[in-house]
């Protein structure tokens, strides 16, 4: 990291790489730290060899650290280094911000993922015990005789995804219409994934809150 950080400083002095001065310097340093950690993980055989992340990838992200309150939420805006105040839709109240990751998804949306300090509230011991049998026709059945079906809206979304993917396959490669259709497919993909995650989160949260012990069949 020390060597690459010195190289970055030298590159900023060169006219060819003057654009680096326009970027958030902390974000650039975090990228170098990520690269350093990736090689550490590789040489310690905890991960595969790091791969090049092209600027043309459909998913992009960068991380920057809060220093001297340079990242903060004010009303309906978040202040980011080099970008200033950006309007947001805030999903929940947050505490002290440590760092933020800005993500750009294939569906053309931006997300600010915040790492914050907060004090978790311990929940009372539910005391219940339940057994879960995951099925194919039904999502699962439990030892209390309850059955949870797979959501129909998820099936509809999957059918729509298949239709949009077929339309994409018929578009001419590198055409403007193919680009627009690719964005439609990405948005349906994202909606389907969000629906699935929302369903799973709600079911798992309900089971954990109502039971102290959960047994599930080993597949």
Residue ranges and their predicted role:
Residues 1-219:
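Nucleic-acid substrate recognition interfaces
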């Amino acid at each position: 990291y020390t060597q690459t950080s010195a190289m970055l400083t030298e590159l900023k002095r060169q006219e060819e790489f003057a654009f680096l001065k326009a970027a958030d310097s902390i974000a650039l340093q975090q990228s170098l730290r990520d690269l350093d950690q990736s090689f550490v993980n590789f040489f310690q055989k905890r991960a595969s060899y790091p791969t090049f992340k092209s600027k043309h990838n459909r998913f992009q992200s960068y991380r920057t650290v809060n220093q001297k309150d340079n990242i903060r939420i004010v009303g309906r805006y978040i202040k980011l280094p080099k970008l200033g105040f950006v309007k947001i839709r805030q999903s929940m109240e947050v505490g002290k911000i440590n760092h933020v990751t800005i993500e750009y998804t294939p569906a053309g949306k931006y997300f600010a993922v915040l790492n914050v300090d907060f004090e978790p509230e311990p929940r009372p011991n539910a005391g219940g015990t339940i057994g879960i049998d995951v099925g194919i026709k039904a999502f699962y059945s439990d030892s209390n005789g309850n059955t949870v079906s797979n959501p129909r809206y998820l099936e509809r979304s999957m059918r729509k995804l298949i239709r949009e993917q077929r339309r994409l396959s018929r578009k001419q490669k590198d055409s403007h219409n193919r680009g627009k259709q690719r964005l439609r497919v990405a948005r349906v993909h994202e909606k389907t994934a969000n629906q699935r995650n929302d369903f799973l989160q709600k079911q798992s949260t309900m089971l954990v809150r109502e039971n102290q012990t959960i047994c599930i069949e080993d597949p």
